[in-house]
């Protein structure tokens, strides 16, 4: 790795940079995109095409203090049932606007805690989805499972619904750290769940672990990673904890004095990364790892890796429909986002309309910049030939962008015969480099019009 001091001067430890799971990022969406435009974009999906679905369940039995996701606590099933009824109505709205023959290629249930849905609601939602968008034979159906909020009946219902992949949030197995973030989930409980899933024939197991949590040390992270690897997940994501109490007030419960500093965070990530690579996983992008033969590793090797709202993916569908409060949809034309408030979302759906609250219509420049950012984060390079073949950008203008970026990141970025490349030792700066192509982020010194 390039000298840490050099990377630090370029912003490694103090820059606040988007994850770029979309471009533009969601904070840059505007209110000018309406439910009518959302409906029109759905109607424009060609007959016989394929789409992906994301179903958002915002409810949790407990609110983990570290989490900044759009969630709300409930001890009753009543709001969950009302929400599920609205999801079925939203699916009916979708079905009414889809062209004949549109198929479901991929589906993900996230939250929140999707597994707090009772078995009957899991069955009902699966049937409503099947009625709205018939599945392909090879449809990949993934679900986020909380090991503390699952039982045999709900697992039965999910497998009967066609679940093929499970994502488990581990965070850290140290009891002290779990107590400090409001998420107690023992290794033994997680182990029993993974063994049950494998016994039932689960095709893919994903796991997330966090670094930068309070009280974390390199030896402690090593212990948690080794325990996680003993469960043989197919994919592992090593994600940085973002302490943003101004955005997520529940994080005020976490004592800031116990949170590792920037240099310590880098050491924690490198500790986890080294152990995972030693265990035979392949690194995919910045922070994902996959076993050889896993579709994600294959997509990475073939240059087909993409960014999505779940991170790195091999999903090639151009259209992603988000269902539920705050869910985001992606179309070739742009992005739409449902009302973040559950009550506002339910009110709109019950009145027979989508709850679209904001979004963004993509310009040609957005598409170009979005693709360059995606290439940097997926492949750590921008292919000159691919960009020129796909977009109407003058070669000399593209070279100007490359030179400006390379000058801003000396010793980290270089111009090659193939295009622009982030050197291996500079890859921790990939998101910061990508930000230099973001015309909506003033702190990233946006480039001029293309």
From Swiss-Prot:
The keyword Transmembrane does not apply. Its cofactor is [4Fe-4S] cluster. It is found in: Cytoplasm. Keywords: 4Fe-4S, Bacteriochlorophyll biosynthesis, Chlorophyll biosynthesis, Cytoplasm, Iron, Iron-sulfur, Metal-binding, Oxidoreductase, Porphyrin biosynthesis, S-adenosyl-L-methionine. The keyword Oxidoreductase applies. The lineage of its organism: Bacteria, Pseudomonadati, Pseudomonadota, Alphaproteobacteria, Rhodobacterales. It catalyses: coproporphyrinogen III + 2 S-adenosyl-L-methionine = protoporphyrinogen IX + 2 5'-deoxyadenosine + 2 L-methionine + 2 CO2. It comes from the Bacteria. One of its GO terms (molecular function) is 4 iron, 4 sulfur cluster binding. One of its GO terms (biological process) is porphyrin-containing compound biosynthetic process. Residues 45-282 form the Radical SAM core domain. S-adenosyl-L-methionine 2 binds at residues 66, 112-113, 171, 183, 208, 242. Involved in the heme and chlorophyll biosynthesis. Catalyzes the anaerobic oxidative decarboxylation of propionate groups of rings A and B of coproporphyrinogen III to yield the vinyl groups in protoporphyrinogen IX. InterPro entries: Aldolase_TIM (IPR013785), Coprogen_oxidase_HemN (IPR004558), Coproporphyrinogen-III_oxidase (IPR034505), Elp3/MiaA/NifB-like_rSAM (IPR006638), rSAM (IPR007197). Binds 1 [4Fe-4S] cluster. The cluster is coordinated with 3 cysteines and an exchangeable S-adenosyl-L-methionine. This is Oxygen-independent coproporphyrinogen III oxidase. One of its GO terms (cellular component) is cytoplasm. It is an enzyme of class 1 (oxidoreductase). Its EC number is 1.3.98.3. Monomer. [4Fe-4S] cluster binds at residues 60, 64, 67.
